[in-house]
Amino acid sequence: MAPKRKSGVSKCETKCTKACPRPAPVPKLLIKGGMEVLDLVTGPDSVTEIEAFLNPRMGQPPTPESLTEGGQYYGWSRGINLATSDTEDSPENNTLPTWSMAKLQLPMLNEDLTCDTLQMWEAVSVKTEVVGSGSLLDVHGFNKPTDTVNTKVISTPVEGSQYHVFAVGGEPLDLQGLVTDARTKYKEEGVVTIKTITKKDMVNKDQVLNPISKAKLDKDGMYPVEIWHPDPAKNENTRYFGNYTGGTTTPPVLQFTNTLTTVLLDENGVGPLCKGEGLYLSCVDIMGRRVTRNYDVHHWRGLPRYFKITLRKRWVKNPYPMASLISSLFNNMLPQVQGQPMEGENTQVEEVRVYDGTEPVPGDPDMTRYVDRFGKTKTVFPGN
């Protein structure tokens, strides 16, 4: 007799007698840019687009405008002066390309700052491109000729090292200082150097990453590109993009289109939040160098950059309690004074007494009592 086939149902299997309980839903907390993000703001006026441009700051300021008194160098640097030795390198300010930056003041969203939630502008995307690359086709100017023997040649076009960076954020761009040679003597006026920030001469650590050599891009045309670089350890509320191509005779390579959109959202779907209704734009676009025909002087060439930023409104939790706002208001009303030290290592405070309630008359009125860091009352017994 053939054996019987066992049932396919396992005897060890247990069935749920009732539905499994579901975890209770809780609000998801997301922190970005120092604000607690809540939700988007919907509506017909919840999205805004802003178009702006930044002009290059290659060393020559916008003024004077006269084309015979320095205005002809606007968009260029002045002639680069070389070091005379390893220890004698002092570049002129007008030969140093610097960062371009601007702050756009956005429409105010909150009339009542006492609410638990506030509206903020959030940068969602940007369309950007360098403007004027066709001007680099000029080969009939008074530049160094491509052949010094044959006279029927063209002028050498702009070529060499190229550097392109742009940034969009709700706060100024954070910068990290780093130089090629810490012995370089930059001018102390007209530009912001590492010495300007640290109040000390540069050291060997400034040739690598020195944690104290940091700054914020708060001035246009003041931060040299060869000194200050985007800080990857910061810039939580800023998005920056860039590339560098080196070489002495590298031809410029540039793509441009009005169809490319760069998304500014992070992995959590949140873009830079504009604190105080301020949007910050920064950029550097160095196309290379030209060499003049008569003196073989090199000039950096920069081009402007166009921005089209899309912003939307977002609800955030109010990070500023009313108590702190009122306290800050009263503190700012008081005059700022500079007196003798009453805090720190050189404090001149002798003794502080705090009374709370009543107690029996102590037999030793000079005994020392204090509250330690754990909140416990301590009594110091007199020594011999």
UniProtKB/Swiss-Prot annotation:
The modification Phosphothreonine is found at residue 358. Forms an icosahedral capsid with a T=7 symmetry and a 40 nm diameter. The capsid is composed of 72 pentamers linked to each other by disulfide bonds and associated with VP2 or VP3 proteins. Interacts with terminal alpha(2,3)-linked sialic acids on the cell surface to provide virion attachment to target cell. This attachment induces virion internalization predominantly through caveolin-mediated endocytosis. Once attached, the virion is internalized by caveolin-mediated endocytosis and traffics to the endoplasmic reticulum. Its main location: virion. Residues 322-384 are annotated as: C-terminal arm. InterPro entries: Capsid_VP1_Polyomavir, dsDNA_vir_gr_I_capsid, Polyomavir_VP1_sf. This is Major capsid protein VP1. Belongs to the polyomaviruses coat protein VP1 family. The keyword Phosphoprotein applies. One of its GO terms (biological process) is virion attachment to host cell. Keywords: Capsid protein, Caveolin-mediated endocytosis of virus by host, Disulfide bond, Host nucleus, Host-virus interaction, Late protein, Phosphoprotein, T=7 icosahedral capsid protein, Viral attachment to host cell, Viral penetration into host cytoplasm, Virion, Virus endocytosis by host, Virus entry into host cell. GO terms for cellular component: host cell nucleus; T=7 icosahedral viral capsid. The keyword Phosphoprotein applies. Homomultimer; disulfide-linked. The virus capsid is composed of 72 icosahedral units, each one composed of five disulfide-linked copies of VP1. Interacts with minor capsid proteins VP2 and VP3. It comes from the Viruses. The virus attaches to the surface of cells by recognition of oligosaccharides terminating in alpha(2,3)-linked sialic acid. A DNA-binding domain overlapping a bipartite nuclear localization signal is present in the N-terminal region of the protein and is required for efficient virus formation. It is found in: Virion; Host nucleus. GO terms for molecular function: structural molecule activity. The lineage of its organism: Viruses, Monodnaviria, Shotokuvirae, Cossaviricota, Papovaviricetes. A motif (Bipartite nuclear localization signal) lies at residues 4-18.
